[in-house]
Amino acid sequence: MDSVAFEDVDVNFTQEEWALLDPSQKNLYRDVMWETMRNLASIGKKWKDQNIKDHYKHRGRNLRSHMLERLYQTKDGSQRGGIFSQFANQNLSKKIPGVKLCESIVYGEVSMGQSSLNRHIKDHSGHEPKEYQEYGEKPDTRNQCWKPFSSHHSFRTHEIIHTGEKLYDCKECGKTFFSLKRIRRHIITHSGYTPYKCKVCGKAFDYPSRFRTHERSHTGEKPYECQECGKAFTCITSVRRHMIKHTGDGPYKCKVCGKPFHSLSSFQVHERIHTGEKPFKCKQCGKAFSCSPTLRIHERTHTGEKPYECKQCGKAFSYLPSLRLHERIHTGEKPFVCKQCGKAFRSASTFQIHERTHTGEKPYECKECGEAFSCIPSMRRHMIKHTGEGPYKCKVCGKPFHSLSPFRIHERTHTGEKPYVCKHCGKAFVSSTSIRIHERTHTGEKPYECKQCGKAFSYLNSFRTHEMIHTGEKPFECKRCGKAFRSSSSFRLHERTHTGQKPYHCKECGKAYSCRASFQRHMLTHAEDGPPYKCMWESL
């Protein structure tokens, strides 16, 4: 039995015949041709074997229509959004010399050149005439929803929702893409070819668009402005992402939490939060990440690379958001203002954590003991008590830390370094947080006020401990005697009554104490002036 070719089952019309058909007849024709193509594809016919171009070249028939109908139509045949082009076929031939027009076999449309025809066939059949042979054929499992799109790129991106597949596999890393252009662009990332180099920081890029966006991080240029609120951005992607805040809508929506996204890549990265997938692994330490940008930022902790430098003080940073946040120290900008107490913050994350001091929200819970926390750093710090491990470990005393900044501060307790000096009294501190709390002793600032009794406090821990007086809460319970305490510091002091631990030793006389306050009181007895309080009564 001879094999069936497309020419054997094709039904064609002249331009005049096509014009006489009513919409329902045209729709019927399209449906029949669509089904024919799919049937041929399902039995393994390769489009390049059909010589479609030659078939139409020698027919001598007129093209069906002098206008290009929009490619993506609704199933009932109605057009959404108008027509692709108003040019007649002969005008297209004149405008593009050397390009022969090939007739489309599906919708009676005109495609410019064989490559356009191939793309057109692929859009309707799900089969790639040329490139499929190289990358391997994949079955078409689409259920068409007939949603219209203004661009081929948008259509192909949408199509993935139905198929769940992409057409091109990278042989290096296995990543898949839905267009040849995108896989070619991706392959460059493996070659290491980066011809566009930044004159300011030396960073190199594979594409001019990425290079131009990066340059704006140095110049501060933000050409893309939100029409709703006027906020400006360095690239079009950022403004689209921002617009979701106003519209509350995006083409991709998370099925788990309902969060909308403007791009497929952002959506896929977000999904990994729920699945726990972390495909990007650090070669240095083995730590895994959900997306490649996070991995690149992490790698800088190993390389020490800090490409972003402050023009005011010269301090360098590993990534751009840290620089932008630091710059606000110089400008004094604090764009995030608390509606409850009026306190302002430099960063959105610090502001969100602060808001929880008013709401009492503690969304992060320890899986080991059930204790809840208002922020992730607090929970991670707590988790070390259970695991006894952390990515950063002190070489002097072996204490583990969950993040780099507390580790750096701790190191100063051994080196004696105190880089933060009070302008009022000259007292020095190991961290910026400590000096801010200390400065309140000079300014009298007490930002934390109790709603029950109106008493105000200089810093959060004192305020939290005070609140427990009203609630009666005593979360720290001694396992030995059952006595409960409001604060962890009081609890630790109590534990020493059972263990006998006395960590504070007097160098003068060798006497030891269980708490710092008792030790400091004792040290006054060795002072040159003697104890500050002396009994004036003479013994009888």
UniProtKB/Swiss-Prot annotation:
<protein>
    <recommendedName>
        <fullName>Zinc finger protein 136</fullName>
    </recommendedName>
</protein>
<dbReference type="GO" id="GO:0000981">
    <property type="term" value="F:DNA-binding transcription factor activity, RNA polymerase II-specific"/>
</dbReference>
<dbReference type="GO" id="GO:0000122">
    <property type="term" value="P:negative regulation of transcription by RNA polymerase II"/>
</dbReference>
<dbReference type="InterPro" id="IPR036051">
    <property type="entry name" value="KRAB_dom_sf"/>
</dbReference>
<dbReference type="Pfam" id="PF00096">
    <property type="entry name" value="zf-C2H2"/>
</dbReference>
<feature type="zinc finger region" description="C2H2-type 1; degenerate">
    <location>
        <begin position="140"/>
        <end position="162"/>
    </location>
</feature>
<feature type="zinc finger region" description="C2H2-type 7">
    <location>
        <begin position="308"/>
        <end position="330"/>
    </location>
</feature>
<keyword id="KW-0805">Transcription regulation</keyword>
<feature type="zinc finger region" description="C2H2-type 4">
    <location>
        <begin position="224"/>
        <end position="246"/>
    </location>
</feature>
<feature type="zinc finger region" description="C2H2-type 12">
    <location>
        <begin position="448"/>
        <end position="470"/>
    </location>
</feature>
<dbReference type="GO" id="GO:0008270">
    <property type="term" value="F:zinc ion binding"/>
</dbReference>
<keyword id="KW-0804">Transcription</keyword>
<keyword id="KW-0678">Repressor</keyword>
<feature type="domain" description="KRAB">
    <location>
        <begin position="4"/>
        <end position="90"/>
    </location>
</feature>
<feature type="modified residue" description="Phosphoserine">
    <location>
        <position position="191"/>
    </location>
</feature>
<feature type="zinc finger region" description="C2H2-type 13">
    <location>
        <begin position="476"/>
        <end position="498"/>
    </location>
</feature>
<dbReference type="InterPro" id="IPR001909">
    <property type="entry name" value="KRAB"/>
</dbReference>
<dbReference type="GO" id="GO:0005634">
    <property type="term" value="C:nucleus"/>
</dbReference>
<dbReference type="Pfam" id="PF13894">
    <property type="entry name" value="zf-C2H2_4"/>
</dbReference>
<dbReference type="GO" id="GO:0006357">
    <property type="term" value="P:regulation of transcription by RNA polymerase II"/>
</dbReference>
<comment type="function">
    <text>May be involved in transcriptional regulation as a weak repressor when alone, or a potent one when fused with a heterologous protein containing a KRAB B-domain.</text>
</comment>
<keyword id="KW-0863">Zinc-finger</keyword>
<keyword id="KW-0238">DNA-binding</keyword>
<feature type="zinc finger region" description="C2H2-type 8">
    <location>
        <begin position="336"/>
        <end position="358"/>
    </location>
</feature>
<feature type="zinc finger region" description="C2H2-type 2">
    <location>
        <begin position="168"/>
        <end position="190"/>
    </location>
</feature>
<keyword id="KW-0862">Zinc</keyword>
<dbReference type="InterPro" id="IPR036236">
    <property type="entry name" value="Znf_C2H2_sf"/>
</dbReference>
<feature type="zinc finger region" description="C2H2-type 14">
    <location>
        <begin position="504"/>
        <end position="526"/>
    </location>
</feature>
<keyword id="KW-0479">Metal-binding</keyword>
<keyword id="KW-0597">Phosphoprotein</keyword>
<feature type="zinc finger region" description="C2H2-type 10">
    <location>
        <begin position="392"/>
        <end position="414"/>
    </location>
</feature>
<feature type="zinc finger region" description="C2H2-type 5">
    <location>
        <begin position="252"/>
        <end position="274"/>
    </location>
</feature>
<dbReference type="GO" id="GO:0000978">
    <property type="term" value="F:RNA polymerase II cis-regulatory region sequence-specific DNA binding"/>
</dbReference>
<keyword id="KW-0677">Repeat</keyword>
<dbReference type="Pfam" id="PF13912">
    <property type="entry name" value="zf-C2H2_6"/>
</dbReference>
<comment type="similarity">
    <text>Belongs to the krueppel C2H2-type zinc-finger protein family.</text>
</comment>
<dbReference type="Pfam" id="PF01352">
    <property type="entry name" value="KRAB"/>
</dbReference>
<feature type="zinc finger region" description="C2H2-type 3">
    <location>
        <begin position="196"/>
        <end position="218"/>
    </location>
</feature>
<feature type="zinc finger region" description="C2H2-type 11">
    <location>
        <begin position="420"/>
        <end position="442"/>
    </location>
</feature>
<dbReference type="InterPro" id="IPR013087">
    <property type="entry name" value="Znf_C2H2_type"/>
</dbReference>
<feature type="zinc finger region" description="C2H2-type 6">
    <location>
        <begin position="280"/>
        <end position="302"/>
    </location>
</feature>
<keyword id="KW-0539">Nucleus</keyword>
